[in-house]
From Swiss-Prot:
CDD domains: uS7_Bacteria. It comes from Ehrlichia ruminantium (strain Gardel). The keyword tRNA-binding applies. GO terms for biological process: translation. GO terms for cellular component: small ribosomal subunit. This is Small ribosomal subunit protein uS7. It holds the Pfam family Ribosomal_S7. The gene is rpsG. One of the primary rRNA binding proteins, it binds directly to 16S rRNA where it nucleates assembly of the head domain of the 30S subunit. Is located at the subunit interface close to the decoding center, probably blocks exit of the E-site tRNA. Keywords: Ribonucleoprotein, Ribosomal protein, RNA-binding, rRNA-binding, tRNA-binding. One of its GO terms (molecular function) is structural constituent of ribosome. Belongs to the universal ribosomal protein uS7 family.
């Protein structure tokens, strides 16, 4: 067992424009090299474009896109008797949110590499795709679900 103390969770201050902790976490995921102002411009610009395209408020688009991408199940490796099994487990709320934020960011980054568009446009497109239950981030979630479903037979090896 570890002799260290359990790490304290950092308190994240809400973002300045929408006063949302989830959006502040998303800005932290997008941020590179401590450039918060650039990350805020990208996220706020993408949200305003999404708001203009759909006609709903930016926060409702963001929260529903996030809820559509958040996974409920994932697989974890468990070694039993010299054999490694992929055991499906439920995902805790905090991990589910952080996975969804990372997947949306990663899907927008890969779209940015494939096209000649700005990152803000790719992020807007990815948020709208996640809102409509399509796109790269939603595809990653569905792959995780398929893995969990395929390994359902090993669910009795749950972690304690």
């Amino acid at each position: 067992m570890s002799r260290r103390r359990r790490a304290n969770k950092r308190v994240i201050t809400p973002d300045s424009k929408y006063n949302s902790v989830l959006l502040a976490r998303f800005i932290n995921v997008i941020m590179r090299s401590g450039e918060r102002s650039i990350a805020e411009k990208i996220v706020y610009g993408a949200l305003s474009k999404a708001e203009n395209r759909i006609g709903e408020s930016a926060m409702s688009v963001f929260s529903s896109a996030l809820n559509n991408v958040m996974p409920q199940m994932e697989v974890r490796s468990r070694r039993i008797g010299g054999v490694t099994y992929q055991v499906p487990v439920e995902v805790k709320e905090d991990r589910s949110v952080s996975l969804a934020l990372r997947w949306i960011s990663r899907a927008a980054a890969t779209a940015r590499k494939r096209s000649n568009k700005m990152y803000m446009d790719c992020l807007c497109n990815e948020l709208l795709e996640a809102y409509n239950k399509r796109g790269g981030a939603y595809k990653i979630r569905e792959e995780k679900y398929k893995m969990a479903e395929a390994n359902k037979a090993f669910s009795h090896f749950r972690f304690n």
